[in-house]
Every structure is written in structure tokens, then in C-alpha cells.
From Swiss-Prot:
First and last residue of the signal peptide: 1-22
Keywords per UniProt: Disulfide bond, Neurotoxin, Secreted, Signal, Toxin
UniProt note: domains: The cysteine framework is V (CC-CC).
Localization per Swiss-Prot or TrEMBL: Secreted
Keyword Transport on entry: no
Matches recorded under InterPro entries: T-conotoxin
Family: Belongs to the conotoxin T superfamily.
The name this protein goes by in its record: Conotoxin TxMRCL-04
């Protein structure tokens, strides 16, 4: 019975904490998906720009 009030208080504290979605975004925030898209685009440009036959995996052809 002593644990019940402590358990209820902990539940109330957990429920009152702000979620990640509640935080305001600034103009500097970038989603992780767009970051991955940028990395893919840069890697695709780099592989099509130059093809080094001596490095395995450098050339996409």
C-alpha cells in the first residue's frame, strides 16, 4: 500500500513532461530524412563525376 501513492505520483510526473513534438522548431532544425537525402544526392554526384578503376566501389557502372 505504501507504493501506491509513489506510483501515482510517478505516473503524474511522467504524463506532465512535454513530448518531443511539443518543442518548437527553429529555422536551423533539419529533419533526419532530408539529411539522409542530401547525403544520398552528394554521394550520387560524386560517383558520377569521376570513376576511379583502382578503387573498388568508386564507380557505379
Amino acid at each position: 500500500m505504501r507504493c501506491l501513492p509513489v506510483f501515482v505520483i510517478l505516473l503524474l510526473l511522467i504524463a506532465s513532461t512535454p513530448s518531443v513534438d511539443a518543442q518548437l522548431k527553429t529555422k536551423d532544425d533539419m529533419s533526419l530524412a532530408s539529411f539522409h537525402d542530401n547525403v544520398k544526392r552528394i554521394l550520387q554526384i560524386r560517383t558520377t563525376e569521376e570513376c576511379c578503376p583502382f578503387i573498388v566501389g568508386c564507380c557505379s557502372r
